[in-house]
UniProtKB/Swiss-Prot annotation:
Protein name: Small ribosomal subunit protein bS6
Gene: rpsF
Top-level taxonomic group: Bacteria
Region listing for Disordered, in residue ranges: 96-139
Keyword Chloroplast in annotation: no
Function comment: Binds together with bS18 to 16S ribosomal RNA.
NCBIfam families in the cross-refs: S6
Regions of compositional bias (Basic and acidic residues) in chain numbering: 104-122
A Pfam family assignment: Ribosomal_S6
GO BP annotations, alphabetical order: translation
């Protein structure tokens, strides 16, 4: 079996159907004895150039180990699905399991937002304590 990196773009109006599509496409590969090494749903992102007058699309990345026949079947499924705007299948030399730069950047943004949320809630708690102390002294 060979290793492949697969990226496909889904029409932004069909974003709700992406989990089902991922399940269907991974099923095609795993039924033929393939293995999914990495699966990342990057979500809706800006396109570099318009495709069919669309400026955004839903991105999905998969790194798999599969047979050539199952990858051909997957490409056929992409071709017959109108929601898939573009797809790219590249053969790689080895399995890639670490997070992609896109996923790492998203994790960093999420952790930054969480820490900012903690910082914002901390002054609010301190203000509440001061207010309670002031009310007690006023009584």
């Amino acid at each position: 079996m060979r290793h492949y990196e697969i990226v496909f773009l889904v029409h932004p109006d069909q974003s709700e159907q992406v989990p089902g599509m991922i399940e269907r496409y991974t099923g095609i590969l795993t039924q033929a004895g393939g293995q999914i090494h990495r699966l990342e749903d990057w979500g809706r992102r800006q396109l570099a150039y318009p495709i069919i007058e669309l400026h955004k699309a839903h991105y999905v990345l998969m790194n798999v180990e599969a047979t050539a026949e199952s990858v051909e079947e997957l490409e056929t499924a992409f071709r017959f699905n109108d929601a898939v705007l573009r797809n790219m299948v590249m053969r790689t030399k080895a399995a890639i399991t670490e997070a992609s730069p896109m996923a790492k950047a998203k994790d960093e943004r999420d952790s930054r937002r969480a820490s900012e949320g903690e910082r914002r809630s901390a002054p609010a708690e301190a203000t509440e304590e001061v207010t309670e102390a002031a009310e007690k002294t006023a009584e």
